[in-house]
Amino acid sequence: MDHCPRLYLASASPRRRELLTQVGLAHTVLHLPAPPGEDEPQWPGEAAADYVLRTARDKAQRGQIWMREQNLPALPLLAADTTVILDGRVLGKPADRSDAVAMLAALSGTKHEVRTAVVLVHEDRLYEAVSITHVSMRALTAAERERYCDSGEPYGKAGAYGIQGLAGSFISHIDGSYSGVMGLPLFETAELLRRAGIALP
């Protein structure tokens, strides 16, 4: 737990922690019981754009319940969810190696979309924002995809890659938020905090 936390983070993602620390926001991670499965399934007929906001809201709701159950001090609660969207299809976290290889093969040589939804709950009010970034990935050989999976980096990441790691060399161009692709768009997050009356350092 950080000294004098200013908000709760309803996420175990080390990348989101790093990004909050980068902008000087002391926080405490809520270690929420994980829902069944690696990813919340997309509902039949649900648009990919709606999916990412729903899953971020779900995280915020579970965080609120956890805060009440644990009798935690009242602080703002921040939740986020990131997904990769290719041709309208959600690519979440890979279930295993074959899933990761298949995702990388699908993304290879494409321009795809990364959406990160951010939800802030403060004094019973809900604040929301969605970051949309277009990412161009160069064509990857089968050997490159296999080597990348050997590194262990694809697992636990939407779309089976992390832009801040080894996969950074796969990305030829982005149009949007680099921090959003990492998992927490700092500009949008700061705007939510300002709207809620929470001063940044």
Swiss-Prot record:
Keyword Iron-sulfur appears in the UniProt entry: no
Cited Pfam families: Maf
CDD domains (alphabetical): Maf
GO-annotated molecular function: dTTP diphosphatase activity; UTP diphosphatase activity
Record keywords: Cytoplasm, Hydrolase, Nucleotide metabolism
Cellular component terms per the entry's GO annotation: cytoplasm
Cofactor entry: a divalent metal cation
Gene Ontology biological-process entries: nucleotide metabolic process
Superkingdom per UniProt: Bacteria
Active site, renumbered: D81 (proton acceptor)
Annotated site location: Important for substrate specificity: R15, T82, Q164
Localization per record: Cytoplasm
Reaction(s) this enzyme catalyzes, per UniProt: dTTP + H2O = dTMP + diphosphate + H(+); UTP + H2O = UMP + diphosphate + H(+)
Presence of the UniProt keyword Cytoplasm in the record: yes
EC number per UniProt: 3.6.1.9
Function as written in the Swiss-Prot or TrEMBL entry: Nucleoside triphosphate pyrophosphatase that hydrolyzes dTTP and UTP. May have a dual role in cell division arrest and in preventing the incorporation of modified nucleotides into cellular nucleic acids.
Family of the protein in this entry: Belongs to the Maf family. YhdE subfamily.
Cross-referenced PANTHER family: BIFUNCTIONAL DTTP/UTP PYROPHOSPHATASE/METHYLTRANSFERASE PROTEIN-RELATED, BIFUNCTIONAL DTTP_UTP PYROPHOSPHATASE_METHYLTRANSFERASE PROTEIN-RELATED
Name the record gives this protein: dTTP/UTP pyrophosphatase
Organism: Bordetella avium (strain 197N)
